[in-house]
Structure formats: structure tokens, C-alpha cells
């Protein structure tokens, strides 16, 4: 797409600002953004926001490595972690609050949002499984290994399944801001 997708514009804000505004707007604390690649520009785009950053010095590595780096920065007192992807900019604060509330009713569970039956993001992981990810398992392996602890919740938010992996997807999402 010519530049990091986190820096693409959606209306007056960048993709990364849309993501973080939803997370912050949902009332979450201890937010960690993992930077890699062209991060001077991304760091500038999030300057002033109440977030911590971690640097992935090998931005070509698997996504799991970025997740591990972020998880290592989370406060030890946190009971759960919401893993948000920076290419899902349309997830609403209300959806994030719904996911967190579902965890309150299913403590220890992995909470995955669905839109019309299709799994989406972000996913909430309990502290009890975070160490598995930090020690080397990827998120998919953790979800599979704890399938009995997964709670899938239907949400009325297409943003959980809309990502920006291709220029066509970006144009489709961008069209919502015109």
C-alpha cells in the first residue's frame, strides 16, 4: 500500500489513531503499542496518547513476536489482556466494553467476538494463558489448547472482521469516511 497501513488515512485520522481512540474510549488502561519498521512516523502519530510502546527490532518476524513483546510490558497485576490488531480500525469502544464485560461473567475464559458467526478481533486472554504466549506459543495454539475455555460472543459490529490486508479492503473501509 506504499506505506505502513497504520499511517493510512481514514477521514481525519490515521488507522492507528482510530484503533487507539476506540481502546482508550472503552476505558482500558495499561495500553501497549508494539512498534516495528517505520516507527518514527508511527510513534509520531500516537504521540501524546496514554500508551506505552515496545519496539520489535525484527519487524519481519511473525506477528506472535510482536504480541510477546507487548505482553511483556503489561502490568503484572492485570488479570486479562485484550490483543488488538492495528489493521482493524473500525472496532467500536462499545464492542470492546462488551468483550471486557463478557470476561467479567466468564473469568479465566478467552473471549472472541463474532460478527454474523465469523470470528474476529480483538480477542481477550486471561492472565493464566499469557505466559504460554510469552514462552513461545502463538495465539492460535493457545486458543486451540484452551478450546473449552473459549467464549465466542456475537456482536453487532462489522469492524471485528474488517481488516486492511489489501488495497481493495482499505478502499472499501475508507469509503465509509467520505
Mark where each language-model region is.
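Conserved donor nucleotide-binding strand/loop of the catalytic core
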Residues: 48-61
Amino acid at each position: 500500500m506504499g506505506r505502513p497501513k497504520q499511517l493510512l488515512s481514514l477521514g481525519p485520522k490515521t488507522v492507528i489513531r482510530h484503533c487507539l481512540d476506540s481502546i482508550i474510549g472503552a476505558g482500558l488502561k495499561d495500553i501497549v503499542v508494539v512498534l516495528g519498521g517505520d516507527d518514527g512516523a508511527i510513534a509520531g502519530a500516537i504521540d501524546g496518547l496514554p500508551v506505552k510502546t515496545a519496539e520489535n527490532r525484527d519487524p519481519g518476524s511473525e506477528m506472535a513476536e510482536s504480541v510477546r513483546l507487548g505482553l511483556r510490558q503489561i502490568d503484572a497485576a492485570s488479570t486479562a489482556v485484550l490483543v488488538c490488531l492495528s489493521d482493524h480500525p473500525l472496532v467500536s469502544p462499545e464492542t470492546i466494553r462488551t468483550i471486557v464485560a463478557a470476561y467479567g461473567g466468564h473469568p479465566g475464559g478467552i473471549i472472541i467476538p463474532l460478527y454474523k458467526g465469523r470470528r474476529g478481533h480483538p480477542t481477550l486472554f486471561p492472565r493464566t494463558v499469557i505466559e504460554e504466549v510469552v514462552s513461545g506459543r502463538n495465539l492460535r495454539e493457545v486458543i486451540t489448547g484452551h478450546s473449552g475455555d473459549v467464549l465466542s460472543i456475537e456482536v453487532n459490529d462489522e469492524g471485528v472482521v474488517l481488516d486492511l490486508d489489501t488495497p481493495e479492503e482499505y478502499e472499501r473501509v475508507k469509503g465509509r469516511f467520505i
